[in-house]
């Protein structure tokens, strides 16, 4: 049983993470953080900026979008991992987040949303506004590798390509199986890009054709996305 890769020490070829003001840097990449939301305000990959404006986690109620700003509090730092926590609340709800960036550029956000009273939520979404020139190609969420569509109303299931089985979208044929799963996407160019994957409290995605967990209630939304 190998113990390689268990520690936070970067593997050979990578450099230690560095933190300067609100910027975290790893090999070839720098992520600027919005100190009020904890989300990236800029992502530079080998000299190529990817974002046109800061990433936003939006909660929409009948009264409109929530304006929740907190304070980013560092919680741990090593050569291979930097972590922070964030919290914001109002009279209706409490939103907390734990964020981690690792030496290979992987960033993980774990959100917890707790209502303080009965509340009608119309939408919860993550917006990643990318520069047009930085995002000519798209792949994932049920789409093959292609030019980035102007509009795409996707869900967790695709009519004619998947069948619903035990809360999981299963491809109907081998020719469409490589489009599955629909929980992640990549958008970018031959120079740089962003890969985004949705996870859950007990959901970490499929494992080839052997392990196909049900999508989590937190974002599955009965297949509607």
Where are these regions (language model features)?
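Beta-strand/loop-rich accessory regions of lumenal/periplasmic or secreted enzymes
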Residues: 2-225
């Amino acid at each position: 049983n190998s113990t390689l890769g268990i520690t936070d020490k970067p593997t050979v070829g990578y450099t230690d993470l560095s933190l300067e003001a609100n910027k975290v840097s790893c090999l070839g990449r720098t992520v600027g953080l919005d100190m009020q939301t904890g989300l990236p305000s800029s992502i530079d990959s080998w000299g190529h900026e990817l974002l046109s404006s800061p990433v936003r986690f939006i909660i929409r109620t009948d009264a409109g979008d929530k304006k929740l700003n907190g304070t980013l509090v560092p919680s741990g730092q090593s050569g291979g991992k930097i972590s922070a926590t964030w919290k914001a609340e109002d009279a209706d709800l409490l939103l907390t987040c734990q964020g981690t960036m690792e030496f290979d550029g992987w960033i993980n956000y774990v959100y917890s949303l707790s209502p303080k009273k009965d509340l009608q939520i119309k939408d919860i979404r993550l917006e990643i506004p990318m520069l047009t020139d930085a995002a000519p190609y798209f792949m994932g969420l049920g789409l093959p590798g292609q030019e980035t569509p102007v509009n795409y109303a996707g869900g967790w299931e695709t009519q004619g390509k998947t069948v619903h089985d035990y809360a999981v979208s299963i491809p109907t044929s081998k020719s469409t199986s490589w489009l599955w799963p629909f929980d992640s996407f990549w958008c970018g160019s031959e120079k740089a890009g962003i890969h985004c994957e949705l996870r859950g409290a007990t959901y970490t995605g499929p494992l080839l054709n052997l392990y196909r967990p049900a999508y989590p209630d937190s974002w599955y939304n009965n297949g509607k996305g």
